[in-house]
Amino acid sequence: MSAIVDIVGREVLDSRGNPTVECDVLLESGVMGRAAVPSGASTGSREAIELRDGDKARYLGKGVLKAVEHINTEISEAVLGLDASEQAFLDKTLIDLDGTDNKSRLGANAMLAVSMAVARAAAEESGLPLYRYLGGMGGMQLPVPMMNVINGGAHANNSLDLQEFMIIPVGAPSFREAVRWGAEVFHALKKIIHDKGMSTAVGDEGGFAPSVENHEAAIQLILQAIEAAGYTAGEQIALGLDCAASEFYKDGQYVLEGEGGLRLTAQQWTDMLATWCDKYPIISIEDGMAEGDWDGWKTLTERLGQNVQLVGDDLFVTNTKILKEGIDKRIANSILIKINQIGTLTETFAAIEMAKRAGYTAVISHRSGETEDSTIADIAVGTNAGQIKTGSLSRSDRIAKYNQLLRIEEDLGDIAFYPGRAAFYNLR
């Protein structure tokens, strides 16, 4: 038995300089697991609640001392003595202790820090790398990275409404090569932006945030960079968008300030997205409609769902109840998996499993406020998710995940598998 003998929560900083929760879990054997939780900027309204102190005199109200106190008191009392290898039972203990539907009493940030740290401690105790502990012998598929090279929306201070413009190395023979391709395109894009006299400063997720004329201009910059780096757009490197459409959905219309204040119905917005998909090698669109616009989602799915991955982030918030409703109504065809949207590892794995059973893809994701914690890299391989979003090819909080995946690929050796385009298995 891997008995938990001590738990310590603490307040640390995330990549935006805001407080977040870190937790250490000590086992009877002397083994320790440590984990830190991320935080989002554009968030779904039905996400599990991240507990903040609200004291404006301290960290502008964003302190997490209440969440830390819950770890060091109530949660500690409830889980001391439990077997760290019983992850599902431990997570259920946390859920029952909180007693709310959205984890608002203890805070999803407190609960997730404990859930992750326990898994790390148990993996260390078992002598297994985390990805192997989480996934057993079946975890051997590296994820296709969706690399956010141009930022807009809530992640940048420019005129772009869409939040992320991503490159996806679908033609790479291995994860290591996919990272190399991405890095080379990133540097080619930097030179192009610089040569055009625009800023090469990066946003929260490490992508550039140039002030361009419109959204197609951003796409064309990326296509130029792919060509300049020596690759073929579409065949070797595809494109992905994260619209984060809830952020520009106002009074029942999609208001695109980056397109001159254009106001579109869901049908008109679908038509615009479809035009872009016909014109450019776009194979994935995340949050193409607002989270509450299920009729719009239905329209988008019927129009593009056979040929484009339509990812629900704010739509599904890693929640199996909402995902099941979406599956039943044939809304979207993919789910974004963010561990802090739901608050425990067990619930995260349940969402991934439900998606796969329904023929939906599952994309493991970071948040815009990250830490050096690389747990999501291990989750991506352990669950054979097939895809990961963890930012651009800069900022150590993003690179930490890529580097961990490179280590995992090396550890797997000849059995490591990079799916490439096959990761988008639900598309024609």
Swiss-Prot record:
- EC number, as in UniProt: 4.2.1.11
Binding locations of (2R)-2-phosphoglycerate = Q163, K338, R367, S368, K389
The biological processes this protein is annotated with in GO are:
glycolytic process
Question: Which residues are involved in binding Mg(2+)?
Answer: D242, E286, D313
Q: What protein family does this chain belong to?
A: Belongs to the enolase family.
Its primary localisation, in coarse terms, equals cytoplasm
Say if the entry is tagged with keyword Secreted: yes
Q: What is the lineage of its organism?
A: Bacteria, Pseudomonadati, Pseudomonadota, Betaproteobacteria, Burkholderiales
Gene from which this protein is expressed: eno
One Pfam entry name: Enolase_N
Subcellular location(s) of the protein: Cytoplasm; Secreted; Cell surface
Cofactor: how and how many bound: Binds a second Mg(2+) ion via substrate during catalysis.
Q: Which domain of life is it from?
A: Bacteria
Q: What is this protein called?
A: Enolase
CDD domains (alphabetical) = enolase
**Keywords of this protein's UniProt record, alphabetized?**
Cytoplasm, Glycolysis, Lyase, Magnesium, Metal-binding, Secreted
* Molecular functions per Gene Ontology: magnesium ion binding; phosphopyruvate hydratase activity
Q: Where is the active site?
A: E205, K338
